Amino acid sequence: MAAPEPAPRRAREREREREDESEDESDILEESPCGRWQKRREQVNQGNMPGLQSTFLAMDTEEGVEVVWNELHFGDRKAFAAHEEKIQTVFEQLVLVDHPNIVKLHKYWLDTSEACARVIFITEYVSSGSLKQFLKKTKKNHKAMNARAWKRWCTQILSALSFLHACSPPIIHGNLTSDTIFIQHNGLIKIGSVWHRIFSNALPDDLRSPIRAEREELRNLHFFPPEYGEVADGTAVDIFSFGMCALEMAVLEIQTNGDTRVTEEAIARARHSLSDPNMREFILCCLARDPARRPSAHSLLFHRVLFEVHSLKLLAAHCFIQHQYLMPENVVEEKTKAMDLHAVLAELPRPRRPPLQWRYSEVSFMELDKFLEDVRNGIYPLMNFAATRPLGLPRVLAPPPEEVQKAKTPTPEPFDSETRKVIQMQCNLERSEDKARWHLTLLLVLEDRLHRQLTYDLLPTDSAQDLASELVHYGFLHEDDRMKLAAFLESTFLKYRGTQA
C-alpha cells in the first residue's frame, strides 16, 4: 500500500495550480489597434449587460488600471457595412458622455477582419460589483439599510439621470435596474449600460438581432413601467425604474415567494413595509402608473426626503475643486506647512462664558484630503444650485439627420479630440537668448492623472486665445477647457511681460 502524500506537498501543488490558473487568466488575448488596451482571458460580469456577447477584463497600459473590454458581434457583414457610419456616429457621441456617476466609455473601434464583424469598446471597470450584489450581502449579514446611505445613493443616481435627461435631445437610459447600477467601496454610485438603449434604437431592424432587451429576463420585469414597449421611450421610463431601485435599496430585497418574476403583491408588501412616510411618498410618486404624473429627476432632488442645505464645507470643497487647475497638486500640504497650527480658525461667542475657540491644530488634514477626493469623485454632488441643463453639455446623441448625399472632397484626416478635462495647469515663461521671443512650458494634469507637458516658442504676435484654440484643434485640450486655459495663459503673459518691461 502506497504511503499517503505528505500534506505540505499537496498544499504546494494546489498553490501551484492556482498560480497557473491565475497566469492563464492574465494572458493577453488581443490588443487594441493603438496598443493601449490589452484584452485578458478573464471574463467579467458587469451587471448582465444585454446585447454583449462577451466582456473581458483588460489593462490600460498607459494608466496601469484595469478596464472592461466589451464586444458586440454582428453575423451579417453586409448589413453591418451598410450602417457602419451610423454605428460610428453613435459611439463617437457616447464617448462624450462624461459624469462622475456614469460608467465612462473610454474608446471604441470596429473590427471587420473576421467572418463576424465586431464593435469593441472599452469601459470603466467597477470592481466592487452591482447594487443588487451589495444588497444581497447586506441582507445576508442581517443588517438594515442605513437611511443616510439610501439618501446618498438616491442623490447620486438622480444626479446622473438629471444629467442624461437634460441633454438635447434627452438621453433615455431605458435599462436602469439594480444590475446596471454599481457601487464602489467608498460609496460612489456608477450607472452602467447607458449605451444600450441608444445603440439599439439607432440600429435598423436587420442589425438588431444581437441586442436583446433586458425585459426578456423575467426577474427584472418589475423595473419596467406599464407603458414600456407600447409608447415611445421618455424620461418617465427611467423615473419608474429609479423608483423600483429606490424601493429595493430601502427594503434590501423584494420577496418573490419562489417565483422567478416579482409580482405586484410583492411590490405592494415592500411599499407598505416602509416606516418613513416621506420615503414611501417619494417612491410612490416615482411608481405612478401614469407617466405624466411622475416627477423629473431634477425635481426629485428637491423632494423633502432628499433635500438638505449644503454645508459650508461642501460648498467650499466644490469651489476649491472647480479652480484646482490654478493650484499646485499638493496645495493642502504646502498651505499647512506655512500655517500656525495654534492660531484660532473660528470662534463661537457664548454669553457669560469664554468664547469657544477652534484652532487649526484640531483640523484633520488627512480627513480633509479624503473629503476633497470624495467630492472630486462625485460622492457628494452639489445639486441645490444645479442648472436644469448640465454644464458644458456636449452636443451628444442627437438623432442622425436624414441621409444626404454629399460630394466627397479630399480633406485632411481629423485629429482625435481630447475627452479628458484638465484639473491643474502650470505655466513657465523664459526669455530666449536673442530676446525676440519667449519659451513657454505648459504642464496640464488631466482628470485621469495623466501629465501632459508642452513647449512652445512664443512670438510677440501670438495670443492666449489662439494658442488655446490650437491645442483644442490638435487634440491636446478638451473643448470645455479652451476659455479656461486662454484666461490662465493671458494672466501669466501679463505677469511675466510686466516684470520684464
From Swiss-Prot:
Entry-annotated residues carrying Phosphothreonine: T409, T411
Pfam families, alphabetically?
Pkinase
Q: Where is this region: Disordered?
A: 1-33
Q: Which domain of life is it from?
A: Eukaryota
**Which GO molecular-function terms appear in the entry?**
ATP binding; protein serine/threonine kinase activity
Q: Where is the composition biased (Basic and acidic residues)?
A: 7-19
Q: GO biological process: any one?
A: neuron differentiation
UniProt subcellular location: Cytoplasm
Keywords from the named record: Cytoplasm, Neurogenesis, Phosphoprotein
| CC annotations in GO | cytoplasm
- Which intervals carry biased composition (Acidic residues)? 20-30
Q: Major location, coarse class?
A: cytoplasm
Residue ranges of domain Protein kinase in the record: 38-306
Q: Which family does it belong to?
A: Belongs to the protein kinase superfamily. Ser/Thr protein kinase family.
Which purpose does this protein serve, as stated in its record?
May regulate apoptosis of neural progenitor cells during their differentiation.
Report the domain remarks. Answer: The protein kinase domain is predicted to be catalytically inactive.
Protein name stated in the entry: Nuclear receptor-binding protein 2
Species this protein is from: Homo sapiens (Human)
